[in-house]
Amino acid sequence: MASSSTSISLLLFVSFILLLVNSRAENASSGSDLDEELAFLAAEESKEQSHGGGSYHEEEHDHQHRDFENYDDLEQGGGEFHHGDHGYEEEPLPPVDEKDVAVLTKDNFTEFVGNNSFAMVEFYAPWCGACQALTPEYAAAATELKGLAALAKIDATEEGDLAQKYEIQGFPTVFLFVDGEMRKTYEGERTKDGIVTWLKKKASPSIHNITTKEEAERVLSAEPKLVFGFLNSLVGSESEELAAASRLEDDLSFYQTASPDIAKLFEIETQVKRPALVLLKKEEEKLARFDGNFTKTAIAEFVSANKVPLVINFTREGASLIFESSVKNQLILFAKANESEKHLPTLREVAKSFKGKFVFVYVQMDNEDYGEAVSGFFGVTGAAPKVLVYTGNEDMRKFILDGELTVNNIKTLAEDFLADKLKPFYKSDPLPENNDGDVKVIVGNNFDEIVLDESKDVLLEIYAPWCGHCQSFEPIYNKLGKYLKGIDSLVVAKMDGTSNEHPRAKADGFPTILFFPGGNKSFDPIAVDVDRTVVELYKFLKKHASIPFKLEKPATPEPVISTMKSDEKIEGDSSKDEL
């Protein structure tokens, strides 16, 4: 029995040794194959360069492209102070007494902004010269504003999650929080007096009493839009809720009265139940009546939904109304100037049914300042008017109306969008007639079919035709495609990121190279961050490919060895013909 047990143990031991040896042999073979493949590619590259092929030197991604997220790049501009403004040295600044400036982290941020009715918060970076210059002014303002508003600062380099949440793009960025909600970016003077004046105005009583007809007539004449409350009393809970809602709005005034005669001047009937509230505008839609619970939140939502025009013309002034709105979904009409009178009344009629759910926008397609650029961003081409829904948030999805521009059709589009029944529209070049080249051409309409094919590993370059870095990289990428064309499991592809789009293909600059592993397409692609050479890209693919592959090198021609005798005649050789 012992002998049998010993034999089994010995057999298992021998089997383990054999497996280990085989595994090492396979690994050695695999490593040897990779070394051989890399040596081949390096030799090919060397040959190219020795014949005047030139080389490509890694540079920063080209950021001249415009992604138009929230149409941000319709105008080139932006803040003065951005990441990287620290390529200089300055004299050390004297110490500043910041005793009244709170230091926030993710652990105390929510409590701080929630406990202070008015909280100003600066996101800064220690290396930022503009932040350092602001420090003494900010500290002095904090001391003067004690009891009225609280000031704080956050090191964005340490609190990355908060910086990402509030989409910090440059330093310093200063926000005003009202009752725990971020309401406004401070863009005033970076001085103590500038900060104090601005904050005092924001924190001052923002609701005004009207007790005489003369006051009412003056307000109605002067104000382009206003909110008016008819209350049981000018003090107490109703007035407090209205005042709290008023602090959330910067661009219109709030008024209140307890007089039925004055209320009537503001389109409120004397017999109506109090509290009553209206929003008056000197626009096509002149009046909106509030019919919700008389609370700060409900009033603020009503005002936000009704303060904008039914349809906003996309202009410099209109853009701020669109992007500062708390409503992110946009329903957009694209039409030329000579067709706007026909279609705008239709859009306004639809807008009445979807307040608070969409911002309705009109883009004049033939307007040189904005219309042409916005139409191009959305991929709206041709002369015919079009309507589409745009999500306006990070995913930036678009849904186009396929049908006549009628009230019913546009309402159905809006309702189907809200019910998540629509298929997104992607900007796309026409499908390529022939797509059998070494590098596959991807457009918006074949992205799913090729890039998201689970049976393939796909390397995708997103480029721009005008991008110099892309032009320099093109011959290298084409060579990689040529070397790998015979590998069925691997696709080397490219997409023009200026005329095609897909939510899975996000580019922060050009060129952007993404890798989509086979069998794993539900996850985000891998950003390829290696030197842009054939060898380094090949090494990346060997490491990350879900489906193992081996480079198919061109066969080396065998040397021809002659075995003919000296007196044999070559068939068909006319030089041996008789005289």
UniProtKB/Swiss-Prot annotation:
GO terms for cellular component: cytosol; endoplasmic reticulum; endoplasmic reticulum lumen; plant-type vacuole; secretory vesicle. The record marks 190 as: Lowers pKa of C-terminal Cys of first active site. Residues 44-69, 80-89, 565-579 have a biased composition (Basic and acidic residues). Disulfide bonds join 128-131, 467-470. Residues 81-204, 416-546 form the Thioredoxin domain. Induction: By chemically-induced ER stress response. InterPro entries: Prot_disulphide_isomerase, Thioredoxin-like_sf, Thioredoxin_CS, Thioredoxin_domain. It holds the Pfam family Thioredoxin. The keyword Ion transport does not apply. It catalyses: Catalyzes the rearrangement of -S-S- bonds in proteins. The record marks 468-469 as: Contributes to redox potential value. It is found in: Endoplasmic reticulum lumen. The record marks 532 as: Lowers pKa of C-terminal Cys of second active site. Keywords: Disulfide bond, Endoplasmic reticulum, Glycoprotein, Isomerase, Redox-active center, Repeat, Signal. A motif (Prevents secretion from ER) lies at residues 576-579. Widely expressed. Residues 1-25 form the signal peptide. Acts as a protein-folding catalyst that interacts with nascent polypeptides to catalyze the formation, isomerization, and reduction or oxidation of disulfide bonds. This is Protein disulfide isomerase-like 1-3.
